[in-house]
Amino acid sequence: MASSHSSGTFTDAGPDDAATRRNGKRTLGDVQGTLLGLAHYLFNFVRGEAASRPALREQATELLRVRMWGIEADEPHRKALAAGDLILVFLGAPERKFIGQAELASAVHDWTPFEAQVYPGDSRGGVLLAEVEEWDPPVPMSTVLSQIDPAENARADFEAGIVRVTANEYETALAVAAARQPRAM
């Protein structure tokens, strides 16, 4: 469900299947365009087939709160995801809004029996999340795109549930989110 499909790309920062790893960890320079060996991804969440399920944002928020994200076997970048990678959580069309960010606490794995009981979806495996931050208000993709150089060819729609993004795209989304947060008095 979390990896259903929409259409287009934000800017897929390129393939990472050639990334070399040492001792199970990504090393500096493994993947072009990464910051200190970390990769940046957009997790694209779109409406599942069942109309009786809760609204899109509530479904995605539930995954963030349990700190788990289901990843299907055919998902692009599945094998490249590693603990420490950074993600943006995006609600696909028609919402087209970022609702948070997180750090991956694990690589993709089959759920343990305990994780399978806790996970609110139907995926057989996925990643664990750490440093989860929900964004309220959510950040419209159009606002982020307006801050990115048009030469980067960033777009708002995606065919894949996981899209590799550049460090600049990731940092731009964080900056826009920070500027939108209510200020404490």
Predicted regions and their residues:
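Aromatic- and Lys/Arg-enriched surface recognition patch
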Residues: 97-167
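Compositionally biased, charged N-terminal/linker segments
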Residues: 3, 10, 14-16, 20-83, ...
